[in-house]
């Protein structure tokens, strides 16, 4: 009997030790983001809801049955833009102008700038000046001008206006710790923190000719877009706080959207349409605001504006998550606790249509951000947030 008791006692001891090892060593209680989180059966597939309030015509048959993606850059990329170049092509005695897309992008680790030709599938390094750890990139119409944003060794945000010339990057620094910058054509909008809130200043692509664009009593803001006639200012989105979107036009402030938890938004260039998302019940919903009709139209797809890009004034391209895991949106996605698996869709804000372009079952998974499309809407790029790689897609 004593031997049996001793044997059972030893087994119990091993069970307790194993439990202790799991609880104190193997169980992750650090609160750090999990790059590949598992939510079990908590997520639900994205379906097209049968809702009388959603006045959209939806076609989920992909335009391209066979999806051909090109991995443009294997290392993480900090920023990308697709431009349209015009070149002269001569065939026999006839010369004509041909428009072709070209992709500019920045390697995140080195800060080197590259130019990629989709038709030739070749990339050329246009700057070998090293800027390690670039976090954010903004572009101008002038392809030789660029804005780099990164955190220096003292934890300060540096903003650098660069000029690409002769294979190197030269330029100048703006003030440290600017909370936000945005570009439009060849103008730069830089946001400064003041005792009263925030101020926005417009300058040229070299930081000259600065003039006041707006004054706000808001401290924590983003600038999702900036155009010739307005600057869009968004309160930083938090799922538990009501956010607002303001337009600053001709010196006046107009509240476009407000009282929306976790509000994140992206206006088109004219400011006529705004795609936005709202946090609710550990998920989110999406809608379009038609400023001309002062009408909000619920979208049949759960899109985050950070995963979209406007083509023309009414056409929106979005990487749409196929499953929405339960979480606090958008911050849990920002912080890396959540990764999505996306498909590519096109939404027409004026016609009220949504059409699937491609599903990436064989090539993915992709959690697409930093979408860019050329003027002719022939070529689209996105960065896969899962690993930072850059991908191109022929529309």
PLM features: residue spans?
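Sequence signature of WD/YWTD-type beta-propeller architectures
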Residues: 2-395
């Amino acid at each position: 009997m004593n031997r049996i008791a001793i044997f059972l006692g030893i087994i119990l001891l091993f069970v307790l030790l194993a439990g202790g090892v799991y609880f104190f060593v193997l169980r992750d209680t650090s609160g750090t983001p999990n790059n590949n989180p598992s939510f079990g059966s908590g997520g639900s597939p994205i379906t097209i809801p049968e809702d009388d309030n959603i006045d959209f015509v939806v076609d989920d048959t992909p335009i391209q049955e066979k999806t051909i993606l090109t991995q443009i850059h294997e290392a993480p990329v900090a920023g990308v833009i697709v431009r349209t170049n015009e070149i002269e092509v001569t065939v026999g005695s006839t010369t004509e102008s041909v428009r072709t897309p070209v992709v500019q992008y920045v390697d995140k680790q080195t800060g080197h700038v590259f130019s990629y030709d989709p038709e030739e599938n070749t990339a050329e390094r246009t700057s070998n000046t090293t800027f390690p750890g670039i976090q954010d990139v903004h572009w101008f119409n002038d392809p030789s001008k660029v804005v780099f944003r990164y955190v220096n060794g003292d934890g300060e945000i540096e903003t650098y206006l660069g000029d690409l010339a002769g294979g190197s990057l030269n330029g100048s620094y703006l003030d440290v710790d600017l909370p936000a910058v945005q570009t439009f054509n060849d103008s730069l909008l830089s946001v400064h923190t003041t005792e009263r809130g925030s101020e926005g200043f417009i300058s040229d692509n070299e930081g000259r000719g600065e003039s006041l664009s707006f004054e706000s009593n808001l401290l924590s803001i983003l600038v999702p877009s900036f155009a010739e006639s307005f600057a869009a200012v968004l309160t930083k989105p938090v799922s538990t706080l009501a956010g607002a979107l303001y337009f600053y036009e001709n010196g006046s402030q107009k509240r476009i959207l407000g009282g929306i938890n976790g509000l994140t938004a992206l206006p088109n260039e004219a400011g006529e349409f705004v795609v936005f998302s709202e946090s609710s019940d550990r998920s989110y919903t999406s809608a379009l605001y038609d400023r001309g009709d002062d009408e909000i139209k619920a979208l049949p797809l759960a899109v985050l504006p950070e995963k979209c890009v406007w083509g023309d004034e009414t056409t929106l391209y979005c990487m749409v998550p196929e499953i929405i895991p339960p979480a606090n949106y958008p911050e849990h996605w920002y912080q890396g606790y959540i990764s999505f698996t996306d498909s590519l869709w096109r939404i027409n804000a004026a016609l009220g249509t949504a059409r699937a372009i491609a599903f990436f079952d064989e090539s993915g998974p992709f959690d697409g951000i930093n979408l860019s499309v050329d003027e002719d809407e022939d070529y689209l790029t996105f960065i896969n947030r899962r690993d930072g790689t850059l991908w191109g897609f022929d529309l």
